[in-house]
């Protein structure tokens, strides 16, 4: 059986905070990878995270690498007014568009509605786009435009 080639894009911060908010639990990256790789040939897999420089985060990032993710880090920026910045929306979008030509499917793990434009663009290129997100915390706009929406439920949690 020939498996479809897939690009996997994980917005680590979004997944962490939505899983914690909804379930007070963490996402199970190992189970997620097993489920995907059973049905898909994972051509590229990126996990986008913020680097705060602490050891616990480095250990987690190394676990992601061991699973098979290419971990992309952006420094955590604390502004003078106390607010913080550290999102990967542009980086995820650029990687999605760069690698879409190599794959049949794109798997996006994020509930961020800003990605609805990206999902539409990928579908316009003939790609199947599956979005994983936490129910109630995933923007309706991205659920509507996705080829398929997969709710992150307790089966995908630690």
Q: Which residue ranges define each predicted feature?
A:
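Domain-level signal for Mg2+-assisted phosphodiester chemistry and nucleotide/NA-binding surfaces
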Residues: 1-88, 128
């Amino acid at each position: 059986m020939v498996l479809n080639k897939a690009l996997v894009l994980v917005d680590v911060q979004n997944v962490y905070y939505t899983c914690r908010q909804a379930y007070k639990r963490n996402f199970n990256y190992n189970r997620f990878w097993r489920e995907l790789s059973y049905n898909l040939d994972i051509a590229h897999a990126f996990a986008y995270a913020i680097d705060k420089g602490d050891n616990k985060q480095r250990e987690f990032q190394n676990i992601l690498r061991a699973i098979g993710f290419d971990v992309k880090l952006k420094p955590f920026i604390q502004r003078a007014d106390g607010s913080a910045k550290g999102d990967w929306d542009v980086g995820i979008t650029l990687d999605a568009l760069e690698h879409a030509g190599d794959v049949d499917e794109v798997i996006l793990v994020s509930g961020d509605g800003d990605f609805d434009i990206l999902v539409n663009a990928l579908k316009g290129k003939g790609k199947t786009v599956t979005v994983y997100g936490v129910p109630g915390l995933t923007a309706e706009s991205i659920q509507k435009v996705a080829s398929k929406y997969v709710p992150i439920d307790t089966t995908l949690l630690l």
